[in-house]
Each structure stands twice: as C-alpha cells, then as structure tokens.
Amino acid sequence: MNKVQPIRDLEKLEELKEELKKKGTRDYMLFYTGLNSGMRVSDVVNLNVNDVKNTNGTMKSYITIVEKKTKKVKRFPLCNGLLVEMEKYTKNMNNGEYLFKSRKGTNKPITTVQAYRIIKKASEKIGLKDIGTHTMRKSFGYHHYQQFKDVALLQAILNHSSPSITMDYIGVNQDNIDISYRNFNI
C-alpha cells in the first residue's frame, strides 16, 4: 500500500475540483474546505453553519474548533477564496446545520469514510493515485510551503512536533530525495 501523497500539480487540483463539482456542491465544498484550511477530515466533516456564520447571518472571519485528534482549540482565518465560496454555499442553510450533511438521516454529518469515498472516486476518475482523506491536508501543506517557504510556520499550522515531520508529511523530503537521486552520477 502506497503512502497518501499531496496533489502537487495545480492543474490536477483544479481538475479534481471540477470533477467534484459534477457530483454536487457538497462534495466540492468538502474538498475545497479541507484544501484551503489544512484541517483534518475528522474536523472538516463536523463543521456546522455556526462555525462559519454569526447568528445574524454574516460570515465569520475566523473558524474556531476543538480538534478531534488533539483536543486542542484551533482558531484560524478563512482565506478569501474559502470565505466567498462558503458564503455562497451556506446561503440557504440554517444555524446548527452540518455543512456536509449525510444524505441518510436528518442533519447528520457525512462520515470520514464517506469523505474518503467521495475524494477517492473523483480522484480515480481523473487518474490520480495515492489519494486518501489526508490528501486535502497534505496538499494544503505542500502548497503553503511552496508559497511561503516557511517550515516553522507550517509546522505550527499543522500542529507538528518538528520541522522534519512536517517536511515528510507534505512530501517535500521525498521530492528532494528523488531529485538528488536523479541528479546523482559517479
């Protein structure tokens, strides 16, 4: 079994987003939210309208959650793109509704297993491999690192214990190893 990888190619990321849109706005927004927040899928699926909107219906500029894995409080701003998309997505939703509702039952979130199936199926349709629920978070990390080149900042965002764990997690160490092998010759 191969290790889940970030999606490094921006064109493939766009292609995957388009594929998810074909399935429905919920599936697209699930991926888009994970991709642009760096949250673990277990936290993404449990978001509800109250997490992103104030009681008067205006959008919050920050999300505050208690991470399911670490039990730590995490507060972070919504990037502009996510803010715009989330405002459109939640326009007709009520406070207390889960953002990514299961189609089974009343106001239940989709499971992490269902999130995996959604992402995996769309990824396979466009020819991506080594995809899993961590793909969103790893892709966030990879592209954040490519934009800002600040491993300490990314380590803090992802709540990792060391820079090397962060670099391994986002696949940058493996990229560097691969490049060194390709360019090595005695």
Question: What residue ranges belong to the model's regions?
Answer:
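Conserved catalytic core of the tyrosine transesterase superfamily
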Residues: 1-186
